Amino acid sequence: MSNITARQTLTRDVQSVDALVRQACKAEANATLLLGTGLLNLTAVDDKDTVVGYLSLDDVSCTRLGSGGPGADTWVQQAAASRFKLGSTAFVRVCATAHLSEIEASAALLRTAFLHMPSLQTLLMVAGGELSFTEPGLAAVFSRVGAHKESGAVLYEAGRDAVVPPLAIRPARVEDHDDMLPILQRCEVAFPALAKLPEASRPHEPFALTRVVAGQDERNRVLVAEAEGRLVGFIVMTSDVDTGSLAETFDLHAYDNFLPPEVYEQQYEAARDSVRGQKLAMLRHQRQQEKEAEGEGAGEAGGQGGNGGVSAGMQTDPEQGEDGEGAAEGEGEGAGEGAGEGGAAAPGTGADKADDSEEAEAQLLAAAEPTDEETRAEMLAMFAGQAPPADPTLFAVTMLCMDPAFEAQAIEFLTPAFAAYTDKLYCVVTLPHDSREPALMGTMTRVAPNPGSLFPEVLFMFHRHALIPDFAVRLGEPGDLDAVASLVAGMPNADDIVASFSGAAAAGSAAVALCQGELVGLVTVNPEVDLELLQANFGLSNHVDLGYQPREQHGEIDMYTMNPIFVHRHRTLVAATMRLLGKTALYYALPPGQQPPDMLEVLEQVAPRHRTASDKQLQAEFALYVFTRQAAFKRRRSVNSQIVVVGASECGLAVVERLLLDPELQFNYLTLLAPGGIKVGGMACQFTAGVIARLGLEARVMLLDAEVIGLDRGSKLLDLSDGSQIFYNQLVLAAGLQDQSRYRFAEADPEVAGLLVTELELAADFSMNDAMVMNSILVYGNAMGAYHSLAVLEAKGAGEKTRFVAPPGQQPPLVGVLHALAGEAGVALPSPEPRDLAGLSVVQPVGPELHASATLIDPADPGPREELPVDLVVGCEPPSVSRSLFTCLNDASLVFDGRLVVDGAFRTNDPAIYAGGSLAKLSRRYGGTHLEHYNSRDVGSRLASSLVSFFNAGPDEPQPAATAAAPPPALHRARAVGCSLPGGNYFVYAGCPAALQRPSTAAPEGGYEMKTASERGLTRITLDGEGRVHSLMYLGRVAVNAPRLGSLVGLHANYLNSLAPKYQAGDIKCLLSFITEPWSELLYNESFPELRETLLEVALAELSAGGREVDGGMVEWVTHAQDAVLEFARAHAAELPGYTMPSAART
């Protein structure tokens, strides 16, 4: 009998599922529709991946497909009402199995359904008759609970225990050793961190496991699990936990620092009082200093004026002695009489002073009130390193070993574990960052570390009350306001949450989660969604199918909160909310700088579109996440490895983007080192400021403004320029090549560093006000960035104040192409003066604008030296490797041969260190090619894919050998470069890697060249000998999108609407206009390469199958290709507004 397993249904299963359902149920299922609307869809496959079963669950009452007669639907609603609880009950909408595999397929489907949804307790199914004879696999677990005579419908029920028999768990005995040992040995490979025997058991000696079992006491416990008459797992626990180190490393205040609540409150109040006292003393000291300063000022004023006022009257001349005192007394009597006659002014003044004093004291007390962050920091300072005053409220799991077939049931250990520790509230597990997560971690809460923590492990927590199975979801009501206010009390945005819930509850767009009747979570939804805005900025078609999901089925999450104890119920709450509100997709928009909600990890991030509409009204400045019916219970596997990406270059950003958007893995510890911040810009940049905002880096990536100054490969530790350190498990070097002028001159005179900027810094920060106050600006270097800098300075009004110099012989090849095109187009370009910048030093300013002096030398006559006063120097030399980074890498013994050498998987000679972008080159085994000639985003994406493949190995599979030879990377996308030019022109050069290695205006050998000159500018396209686009050049007054034009490079000319024949016939007057006509929009779509690969695969399959007619034409392929293109256009209709769909293809 073949091995049958069940998994979530994939899009590629749709045709096979529809055929199976048609055969088994004699009905049409429309699996595509069910994928978007069902609660959970599972497919059973045999060991040949043949579909042999399909199960679709729903959370509304329904009859099973192919069952039930007239009146059955109404009867089901009534009969199942008392048994159905949203969040823990589901209906079987479709269950179809191959006849010969019914028992095995049914068992696999039902078991997977319950294990996939931990909250699911009961399945209900309405069949058209008895199951016993027709479907014995279902009959074995479903019990009949009702029937409807008129329709012939029968209601069946299956509980979790009937499908997934609970494990028999008991304390371990010494004689269990022989059964426990094989499980331990298997887990030493799959999960070594949880299969590590304690040192006290002498793990290197025989029978160490026996000693662990024999050493049980009230603090150390061992439990074993049995199923089907055999031992299938064991767990080792201890209540001897160092909570002090955990409190110093992790934010545990939501869990009372694992102390009894009354002890935590005492410590909290003590710390609060301490902070209040310190702040009050400081504020009073400041107030006293201010009073003294005011008094000194008043005294000076009294000495200068004719009337000393009150303070002058109180002063006594020391020479007066007793006479002076008597005089004062006499004056006082007279004054008293006058005051009496004048009314009650004196007493009133005293009262006012008292009131002012009380008010000032109240203001001091209010200002001294500690914040929660200050109190927590003080708690750490006061109690760190001290023994806890009471037993902590937790126990720790130190070992967990399970048979793979029962690993998903490991959570069943927790109930007897808490029973063994009756006084404990929390169970914790720590895992090294590079360890895989077993299934149990999916039900636990990952605790956030404190900023700057170097603790080498990840902490997971589970609360005793999270085991309560009574969890339900219903619509929110106005009467829930008090419970909501209690739930969110103490949160910074508590008032906003309450206000949002109040409005949403009144409108019927709020849902609440209840545990034993107590409100533990809530969500409010905005039923209106701007789909046009979302489609214009994000790849929405990868997550939802608007053809099947109309506008009213989309909503946006406004507010969300859940008691930390129940965070493992996020999916249940959101999925139930969707059903209650009739939605198939819920979105969450996260603006930059906003704290992400806890439930973000159950949402899927929607990829930002890099090529968006130019309409500013359709520009989104937020990251978008989505929760769909199709992916409601699709869990991405967590990766806790600390991945550090060095450099916010296009390659580095592409690595981060690919990891964030991976559909199968969730990377929880990403760090990006971006010295000076993330700087993007330029017409050829593939990451605009809008794309960065839509990536939402702040939500899931730690951004550090620091450079690497030290690398310890042995400890996997980086020293940073800000004095901090950071550990890594995988390090990605993507700093790229940079202009080194700043570093070279700053070594001689550190003060000049502030005068040197790069072209990106100039474009981002230089203003017209700067142009007005500066008198002399030097652009140094002849890289392409120099011309962009000149254009920026010209546009800001500083063109006349700019001098352009460069060392002779420094012209890069692409600049030569630029000048050649400019000559053809009749465009005058500035040429640099041949000068060397011999020195740059800060001088004492004669005027406010003079900052430094630049020493220029003419290489043809090096004797005379010109001293040029400069206010700003723009470094535009050909980029090279940072000297400090090179020193760091060289000291770490990484192989460097002009560039950092990598293999086909982008690994350096250290398998934990990867490199890409212009910093790296392939090893000689792969031709030694410099990666700077390739598309940086493509390189970064491929590098990230190499990381993903490393983490994708299964728990029983060894991860890919670090020394294994990887195939060469498949890099095909063109690289586009370009810049704005002085005079209002623009230049673009896009080419394949071969074209970038040897840039030229001519076609390659055996190729073909096309050129047009029009009022829009000069456009040149070259084809190689195979008819593919080799390079594309443009110089003119149109600000074209360089990466967009680059997407045409590598395509055969046949894709370009018969480009070559039309050009030869003289029908094309302007190449730029022709390749940007509406017909070309499909070619520019970011998903078009995937469509092209699909078409090529189908064509190759047809050829391999001998699918040819007598005249050599492809059989059926053309029809399949047309269908694929129409389906692509339908799914991406919002991104292709210029395309009109045939009526037959719209559904």
Curated annotation (Swiss-Prot):
UniProt KW Cytoplasm keyword: yes
Matching SUPFAM superfamilies: Acyl-CoA N-acyltransferases (Nat), FAD/NAD(P)-binding domain
Subunit: Identified in a spoke-associated complex containing CFAP61, CFAP91 and CFAP251; the complex is associated with the radial spokes in the axoneme. The complex associates with Calmodulin; the association is calcium sensitive.
Subcellular location: Cytoplasm, Cytoskeleton, Flagellum axoneme
Predominant location category: cytoplasm
GO cellular component, one term: motile cilium
Chain segments carrying region Disordered: 282-362
Acidic residues composition bias: residue spans: 319-334
Domain of life: Eukaryota
Biological role: As component of a spoke-associated complex, regulates flagellar dynein activity by mediating regulatory signals between the radial spokes and dynein arms.
Name of the protein in question: Cilia- and flagella-associated protein 61
